Amino acid sequence: MGLSFSGARPCCCRNNVLITDDGEVVSLTAHDFDVVDIESEEEGNFYVPPDMRVVTRAPGRQRLRSSDPPSRHTHRRTPGGACPATQFPPPMSDSE
């Protein structure tokens, strides 16, 4: 058994909400779904076995877009493998 929502199109405005073709806003809760038999061939195939699933991209690290901010856990390294030394100006003396 599985859950299926019929007669609705996705809404990009709010999370967990669908807007039906009639314009009705529906919150996505368990009460808004109909119970269906996922092994049934009547309405289409609801279950795809893992070995038959289509992979659209290879798993792995995602590349950052230029608009993405760097992660605070990302450390940039020099080609030698060591972190570059931070250079600060010399401290000011009392005479300055």
Curated annotation (Swiss-Prot):
GO biological process: anatomical structure morphogenesis; viral budding from Golgi membrane
Annotated stretches, region: Disordered: 57-96
Pfam families listed in its UniProt record: UL11 (PF11094)
Posttranslational mods: Myristoylation and palmitoylation (probably on one or more of the nearby cysteines at the N-terminus) enable membrane-binding and Golgi apparatus-specific targeting and are essential for efficient packaging. Phosphorylated. Phosphorylation does not seem to be required for recycling to the host Golgi apparatus. Packaging is selective for underphosphorylated forms.
Sites of N-myristoyl glycine lipidation: G2
TM ranges: none
Motif (Di-leucine-like internalization motif): 18-19
Coiled coil: none
Places the protein is found: Virion tegument; Virion membrane; Host cell membrane; Host Golgi apparatus membrane
Biased composition (Pro residues): 87-96
Record keywords, A-Z: Host cell membrane, Host Golgi apparatus, Host membrane, Lipoprotein, Membrane, Myristate, Palmitate, Phosphoprotein, Virion, Virion tegument
Residue numbers spanned by region Asp/Glu-rich (acidic): 37-43
InterPro entries, per the entry: Tegument_UL11_Herpesvir, UL11_simplexvirus
Membrane-topology annotation of the record: Lipid-anchor
Location, primary (coarse class): virion
Modification Phosphoserine occurs at: S40
GO cellular component: host cell Golgi membrane; host cell plasma membrane; membrane; viral tegument; virion membrane
Subunit structure: Interacts with cytoplasmic envelopment protein 2; this interaction is essential for the proper localization of each protein to the assembly complex and thus for the production of infectious virus. Interacts with gE (via C-terminus). Interacts with gD (via C-terminus). Interacts with UL56.
Its biological purpose: Plays an important role in the cytoplasmic envelopment of tegument proteins and capsids during the assembly and egress processes. Also participates in viral entry at the fusion step probably by regulating the core fusion machinery.
Entry similarity comment: Belongs to the herpesviridae cytoplasmic envelopment protein 3 family.
Protein name stated in the entry: Cytoplasmic envelopment protein 3
Species assigned in the record: Human herpesvirus 1 (strain KOS) (HHV-1)
Lineage: Viruses, Duplodnaviria, Heunggongvirae, Peploviricota, Herviviricetes
